[in-house]
């Protein structure tokens, strides 16, 4: 007798690992969430039935919280499931069982319920219980790194190093940029080079390493990295590992006094933006005009300034005749305010241009920021991410 696929799957999967394998296989086969959502609905239904028979099963309730999040896309629902479970059974649970729940709550609060203070609360409870690991210290380090409390973050990453056999690349990377922010540039270089060896195409790692090499005076070592970053520049950053923004690369080249490259990237950005009309002033203009001055390209600087202002003035004329903001919906006063805002953008660029060309003023680069890497998932035995034999 033929057994339907759903029934056959239901018979086969008796353990968490069997469910995880089934889920991961379905995800590999399907490129769309809608096409593999059914496996989490099946898993949710299975777990709910199991918990009716044994409502105190820690593994099942934690897996149910994960299934709920995947099905309903709502971290708060999952958090509520686990916290209600704790209220009901906390006295009956041993420390190992509580630790599993606390770690899952930390992950869910950080990424899906958007409350990293509660995430910190559960991480701290784990440390107080003696349930320490590379994951716990790394995520706590991330918490302080996000708040620019670099010394506290460094303490966490130093504790993480005691569990070096458990570490992943994001652990070393976040430790590396924390060392950088604390002024330990040589140690940061060592850590970021380790990351680079593992992921030589990661835009984020390349950027952080290049910045660090500037401060360790390793310009020769930085050269191929600066070249490689040019291949990864983009108007938008979809994935931290894959793209670097134009403004980020301009900042970096300017810091290295790579003025020809600074000009190249700024003009490449203008071309890709198809900048036919308006612009918003940002530090990139300062670095661009200063770079042209250092290269002796005064005529080019003058022509580019004139070109940008002419285009922007045409945009202002369109506002005046109601082509941009329909006068049916916007008052004369509001349209007047829009025009003033646009004129101010021109004024800012003119002011910085004159200041650079007519004095010894050098714009200072104070805005470079290194993004931290987030742990994709540290849910205990997450069926999507756990490693299977």
Tell where the protein language model's regions lie, with residue ranges.
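Single-residue signature of alpha-solenoid repeat helices
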Residues: 39, 43, 78, 118-119, ...
